[in-house]
């Protein structure tokens, strides 16, 4: 029975929208921004109120059924003598064709469940959809890969990186949130359905383990069972060549469901394969992790993410330094910017306390109503892609005085002209579950890029402001520079995307590491080439 038809839909947030995927057409996804997930809690609170009323009604109905049961049971226990009392005979004759029919065909249960069903239908469009469940599952796999997380630990609510015999705690939650067997099954099934057995098998193994512990217990909200998990895991093992594992799991399945003819045929098939090629199929097979989308720099990228900020400090390299920066601007004379040079090639600087808490909150509030799934330039088009999971909004400086003040501060700090069309509007980004942006350049690398539609050249510089803190993950990794910068709330990260010659600086290839725990907000200001001719003059030195 699907979750749309079960009371489970009222109990598990990400399963609330599971049903007909077509019903979600035109609805904004939830998993790609945490602010969208937070909004989904409001309709769930309304559903909890409806469920509470339903439970009270059911409790009253069950008390009445218990009363009827006790009454009839007491009559049976008292019948030590033949039924001769005419009153007793009458009640028996009435009870069998009438009372029992009323009990069995009572509409009270149907009427009780109608209220939560109606309440669910009213808020269904505001709930996460089937695609969100898939997106959330893929996010867990992304975190599993990027931070080398142990699946068993994740299921127990523990964030640990496991490398060989070494275990490193990446994050210690104040309150543990463990996953159920059905939760693990759903994650494994998402991977299984795309042929990704590298991720499917450990999640399905954990589901089988948890289902075994609770076998015989019935949970309304569960969609899957031990038999389902064994079925999927057995076939996944077979698909990767581990026939011995597939046979063992299939035999276990038949213990619980001995009449399943399909599984019985599978057992015979696996036994025959092992008899014919036992030396090839009995051993456990190493499964290669899929590299989709293809990413040549994946190992470097994930290594930098795992270090959670690997840049050297000015204590280690004397050429790196900290200073108070005025840039010869009267605007910064009384309140200089607190500059920390993070790296020299590419030149990357971090400006601490670039915005205040109040300014950061205001910018988030201005952007939130306008957030839409982030896109990337692909040729002449802009597309939603798996390698960028976030939502973004664009804010003009006329929206609020705080944005005017921010633009003045950016102009004073950089010495650049940031008035349109020489700079883009402020882009505000909120990252979702495991939100990330895989290695990319901010500047255009193709002459057909949509960036050139502004008629102001390529993106010469980037200023990225961290509008929030995170508890773990979310660092900015510079791949070829081989360093990463952790999230520092209210700080701004600045770098040049282009050499003075106008050529792109390949060393600026960077990525937003997946957010392990936390709600990551950033604001990007991209400043273009045109308008900066006398502020950053051209130079033929390719290294400048």
From Swiss-Prot:
Q: What is the taxonomic lineage of the source species?
A: Eukaryota, Metazoa, Chordata, Craniata, Vertebrata
Q: Which residues of this UniProt protein bind Fe cation?
A: 440, 442, 510
* Positions glycosylated per UniProt: 242, 482
Q: How is it modified after translation?
A: N-glycosylation plays no role in the catalytic activity.
Checking Gene3D superfamilies in the record gives: 6.10.140.1460, q2cbj1_9rhob like domain, Tetratricopeptide repeat domain
Q: Provide the assembly information.
A: Heterotetramer of two alpha-3 chains and two beta chains (the beta chain is the multi-functional PDI).
> Where does the record place it?
Endoplasmic reticulum lumen
Catalytic activity annotation: L-prolyl-[collagen] + 2-oxoglutarate + O2 = trans-4-hydroxy-L-prolyl-[collagen] + succinate + CO2
TPR repeat intervals: 227-260
**Keyword flag Methyltransferase:** no
Task: Please give the function described in this protein's UniProt entry.
Answer: Catalyzes the post-translational formation of 4-hydroxyproline in -Xaa-Pro-Gly- sequences in collagens and other proteins.
Q: Known EC number(s)?
A: 1.14.11.2
Q: What is this protein's record name?
A: Prolyl 4-hydroxylase subunit alpha-3
Q: GO terms for molecular function, please?
A: iron ion binding; L-ascorbic acid binding; procollagen-proline 4-dioxygenase activity
């Amino acid at each position: 029975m699907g979750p749309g038809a079960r009371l489970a839909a009222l109990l598990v947030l990400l399963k609330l929208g599971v049903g007909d995927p077509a019903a979600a057409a035109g609805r904004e996804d939830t998993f790609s921004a945490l602010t969208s997930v937070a909004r989904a809690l409001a309709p769930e609170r309304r559903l909890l109120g409806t469920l509470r009323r339903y439970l009270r009604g059911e409790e009253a109905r069950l008390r009445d059924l218990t009363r009827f049961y006790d009454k009839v049971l007491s009559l049976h226990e008292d019948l030590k003598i033949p039924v001769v009392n005419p009153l007793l005979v009458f009640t028996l004759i009435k009870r069998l064709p009438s009372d029992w029919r009323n009990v069995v065909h009572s509409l009270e249960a149907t009427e009780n469940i109608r209220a939560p069903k109606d309440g669910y239908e009213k808020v269904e469009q505001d709930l996460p959809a089937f695609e969100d469940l898939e997106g959330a599952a893929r996010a867990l796999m992304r975190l599993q890969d990027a931070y080398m997380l142990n699946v068993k630990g994740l299921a127990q609510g523990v964030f640990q990186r496991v490398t060989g015999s070494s275990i490193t705690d990446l994050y210690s939650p104040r309150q543990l949130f463990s996953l159920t067997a059905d939760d693990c099954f759903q994650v494994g099934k998402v991977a299984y359905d795309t042929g990704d057995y590298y991720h499917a098998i450990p999640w399905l193994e954990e589901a089988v383990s948890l289902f075994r512990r609770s076998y015989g217990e019935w949970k309304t909200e569960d969609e899957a069972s031990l038999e389902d998990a064994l079925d999927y895991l057995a076939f996944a093992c077979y698909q990767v060549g581990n026939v011995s594992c597939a046979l063992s799991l299939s035999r276990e399945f038949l213990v619980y469901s001995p009449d399943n003819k399909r599984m019985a045929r599978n057992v015979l098939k696996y036994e025959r394969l092992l008899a014919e090629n036992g030396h090839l199929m009995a051993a456990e097979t190493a499964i290669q992790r899929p590299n989709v989308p293809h990413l040549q720099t994946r190992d470097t990228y994930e290594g930098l993410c795992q270090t959670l900020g690997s840049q050297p400090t000015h204590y280690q390299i004397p050429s790196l330094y900290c200073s108070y920066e005025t840039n010869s601007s009267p605007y910064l004379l009384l309140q200089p910017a607190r500059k920390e040079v993070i790296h020299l090639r590419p030149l990357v600087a971090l400006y601490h306390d670039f915005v205040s808490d109040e300014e950061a909150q205001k910018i988030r509030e201005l952007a939130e109503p306008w957030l839409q799934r982030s896109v990337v330039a692909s040729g002449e088009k802009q597309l939603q892609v798996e390698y960028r999971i976030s939502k973004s909004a664009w804010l003009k400086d006329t929206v609020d005085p705080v944005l005017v003040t921010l633009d003045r501060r950016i102009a004073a700090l950089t010495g650049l002209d940031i008035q349109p069309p020489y700079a883009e509007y402020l882009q505000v980004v909120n990252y979702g579950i495991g939100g990330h942006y895989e290695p990319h350049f901010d500047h255009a690398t193709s002459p057909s890029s949509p960036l050139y539609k502004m008629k102001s050249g390529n993106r010469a510089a980037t200023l990225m402001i961290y509008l929030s803190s995170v508890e773990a993950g979310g660092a900015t990794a510079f791949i070829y520079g081989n360093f990463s910068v952790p999230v520092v709330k209210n700080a701004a990260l600045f770098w040049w995307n282009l050499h003075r010659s106008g050529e792109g600086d390949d060393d600026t290839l960077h990525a937003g590491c997946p957010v392990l725990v936390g709600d990551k907000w950033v604001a990007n200001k991209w400043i273009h080439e045109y308008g900066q001719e006398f502020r950053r003059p051209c130079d033929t030195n390719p290294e400048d």
